[in-house]
Amino acid sequence: GLHMGLLSAVVFGAARLILALHPVSATGWPSRSIAAAAALIAATGYLALSGGNVATERAYIMCAVALCALMIGRRAISLRAVAVAGIIVLTLRPEALMGPGFQMSFAATTALVAVFGWMRDFEGEVIPKRLRPVAAIVISSAVAGFATAPISAAHFNTVAHYGLVANLLSVPLMGVLVIPAAVLAAILAPIGG
């Protein structure tokens, strides 16, 4: 889920940047919708390349719902989008409801959307602007860890003791180095020999 989300975000941002470079596309075209469509195509390609296992399908559906919401001018990250993704996943695979993967991914996503929605709507600046990227990683890791801990304990009789620390180290690395390098490699692959 994280990889697909990061890939979609990188492609969305790159497409918006490319469209902003020319005055016609910057002002006359629906650049947000076009960028969301490009990100959806990239996510679809990632789904095809990854083999389309259940976890990747679930991440793709959640990502596709968010990107389609952007294409039609709606808020991409909302509890409604999470609910729509859940309905689609359960329609395609009803047995997923009892699996730890479904429960943990939707618990984490619901908690993250709720917490960041509350923070977005909160009046005033609690966190200084320059610290927000770091705070977002810490908050995301903590919220996801707390949301999934009871489910992990119920299914596996254990909780991840070092999950917060591991995420604090791996998420920035994935977002800044690995995913952009993978996108660049995929774009340049037809050119190379």
Q: Can you name each region flagged by the protein language model?
A:
Residues G1-L164, A181:
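Hydrophobic alpha-helical transmembrane segments in multi-pass membrane proteins
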Residues T158-A166, L184-G193:
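Membrane-interfacial interhelical loops
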